Amino acid sequence: MEGGAAASTPAALPYYVAFSQLLGLTLVAMTGAWLGLYRGGIAWESDLQFNAHPLCMVIGLIFLQGDALLVYRVFRNEAKRTTKVLHGLLHIFALVIALVGLVAVFDYHRKEGYADLYSLHSWCGILVFVLYFVQWLVGFSFFLFPGASFSLRSRYRPQHIFFGATIFLLSVGTALLGLKEALLFKLRDKYSAFEPEGVLANVLGLLLACFGGAVLYILTRADWKRPSQAEEQALSMDFKTLTEGDSPGSQ
């Protein structure tokens, strides 16, 4: 890069990222296998519409959200604006897919005459979706929309990082609640008899937890954070000077 050599990538980081992706892709594939083998598959205009809900939520609020959080670790030496745009786009895709999953479950309940929003899973799910949408909206306003000042972005950034990790953790927990609810609703007493579907779903739950743990571990390693590039620091100082009247040497 111009203005200085690119920072080297920590030796172990690519292996942890690759492992997280292996877990995530296996998670998505196993979710599809569970729905195909034991739940009849997915179809929008039938009683299989409900099955779109778990698949969409796993793809959107687990896999894509996790990958969006890892963007700043994976693309450590790319242009900051490019990384921001990719981070935001992955979150948009996750949000849209999750919205499809929400529509599927509410529409299915309406057609079948089931009550809505009575379980802990549903309450947590709505909370996660609302928080995720607000997080994306505020993040866009602060970091992609050009109106926010540098000092305002700097003050908000720690909150953005904290709530991003928290919402992801809540998403994993909510998915685990939903998985258990789906198993108990269908299998009931047979669940304790080690039914094949129950065993497969238990493995799916372990994959959910492991993927969440892998993503959070990568995020919390301070030595794996994206290093500040020289030109980014210069642009930040220039922007602050223009918007607040400070001099670059006032820090």
Swiss-Prot record:
<keyword id="KW-0968">Cytoplasmic vesicle</keyword>
<keyword id="KW-0472">Membrane</keyword>
<keyword id="KW-0349">Heme</keyword>
<comment type="function">
    <text>Transmembrane reductase that uses ascorbate as an electron donor in the cytoplasm and transfers electrons across membranes to reduce monodehydro-L-ascorbate radical in the lumen of secretory vesicles. It is therefore involved the regeneration and homeostasis within secretory vesicles of ascorbate which in turn provides reducing equivalents needed to support the activity of intravesicular enzymes.</text>
</comment>
<feature type="topological domain" description="Cytoplasmic">
    <location>
        <begin position="1"/>
        <end position="16"/>
    </location>
</feature>
<feature type="binding site">
    <location>
        <position position="225"/>
    </location>
    <ligand>
        <name>heme b 2</name>
    </ligand>
</feature>
<feature type="transmembrane region" description="Helical">
    <location>
        <begin position="125"/>
        <end position="145"/>
    </location>
</feature>
<keyword id="KW-0249">Electron transport</keyword>
<feature type="topological domain" description="Cytoplasmic">
    <location>
        <begin position="73"/>
        <end position="85"/>
    </location>
</feature>
<feature type="transmembrane region" description="Helical">
    <location>
        <begin position="159"/>
        <end position="179"/>
    </location>
</feature>
<feature type="binding site">
    <location>
        <position position="153"/>
    </location>
    <ligand>
        <name>L-ascorbate</name>
    </ligand>
</feature>
<feature type="transmembrane region" description="Helical">
    <location>
        <begin position="86"/>
        <end position="106"/>
    </location>
</feature>
<feature type="transmembrane region" description="Helical">
    <location>
        <begin position="17"/>
        <end position="37"/>
    </location>
</feature>
<feature type="transmembrane region" description="Helical">
    <location>
        <begin position="52"/>
        <end position="72"/>
    </location>
</feature>
<feature type="topological domain" description="Cytoplasmic">
    <location>
        <begin position="220"/>
        <end position="251"/>
    </location>
</feature>
<feature type="binding site" description="axial binding residue">
    <location>
        <position position="160"/>
    </location>
    <ligand>
        <name>heme b 2</name>
    </ligand>
</feature>
<dbReference type="Pfam" id="PF03188">
    <property type="entry name" value="Cytochrom_B561"/>
</dbReference>
<feature type="domain" description="Cytochrome b561">
    <location>
        <begin position="19"/>
        <end position="220"/>
    </location>
</feature>
<feature type="topological domain" description="Cytoplasmic">
    <location>
        <begin position="146"/>
        <end position="158"/>
    </location>
</feature>
<feature type="binding site">
    <location>
        <position position="80"/>
    </location>
    <ligand>
        <name>L-ascorbate</name>
    </ligand>
</feature>
<feature type="binding site">
    <location>
        <begin position="116"/>
        <end position="119"/>
    </location>
    <ligand>
        <name>heme b 1</name>
    </ligand>
</feature>
<feature type="modified residue" description="N-acetylmethionine">
    <location>
        <position position="1"/>
    </location>
</feature>
<feature type="binding site" description="axial binding residue">
    <location>
        <position position="121"/>
    </location>
    <ligand>
        <name>heme b 1</name>
    </ligand>
</feature>
<protein>
    <recommendedName>
        <fullName>Transmembrane ascorbate-dependent reductase CYB561</fullName>
        <ecNumber>7.2.1.-</ecNumber>
    </recommendedName>
</protein>
<feature type="binding site">
    <location>
        <position position="84"/>
    </location>
    <ligand>
        <name>L-ascorbate</name>
    </ligand>
</feature>
<feature type="binding site">
    <location>
        <position position="73"/>
    </location>
    <ligand>
        <name>heme b 2</name>
    </ligand>
</feature>
<feature type="topological domain" description="Vesicular">
    <location>
        <begin position="38"/>
        <end position="51"/>
    </location>
</feature>
<dbReference type="GO" id="GO:0140576">
    <property type="term" value="P:ascorbate homeostasis"/>
</dbReference>
<dbReference type="GO" id="GO:0046872">
    <property type="term" value="F:metal ion binding"/>
</dbReference>
<keyword id="KW-0812">Transmembrane</keyword>
<keyword id="KW-0479">Metal-binding</keyword>
<dbReference type="GO" id="GO:0005765">
    <property type="term" value="C:lysosomal membrane"/>
</dbReference>
<dbReference type="GO" id="GO:0140575">
    <property type="term" value="F:transmembrane monodehydroascorbate reductase activity"/>
</dbReference>
<feature type="binding site" description="axial binding residue">
    <location>
        <position position="53"/>
    </location>
    <ligand>
        <name>heme b 1</name>
    </ligand>
</feature>
<keyword id="KW-1133">Transmembrane helix</keyword>
<keyword id="KW-1278">Translocase</keyword>
<feature type="topological domain" description="Vesicular">
    <location>
        <begin position="107"/>
        <end position="124"/>
    </location>
</feature>
<feature type="transmembrane region" description="Helical">
    <location>
        <begin position="199"/>
        <end position="219"/>
    </location>
</feature>
<dbReference type="InterPro" id="IPR006593">
    <property type="entry name" value="Cyt_b561/ferric_Rdtase_TM"/>
</dbReference>
<keyword id="KW-0597">Phosphoprotein</keyword>
<feature type="binding site" description="axial binding residue">
    <location>
        <position position="87"/>
    </location>
    <ligand>
        <name>heme b 2</name>
    </ligand>
</feature>
<feature type="binding site">
    <location>
        <position position="181"/>
    </location>
    <ligand>
        <name>heme b 1</name>
    </ligand>
</feature>
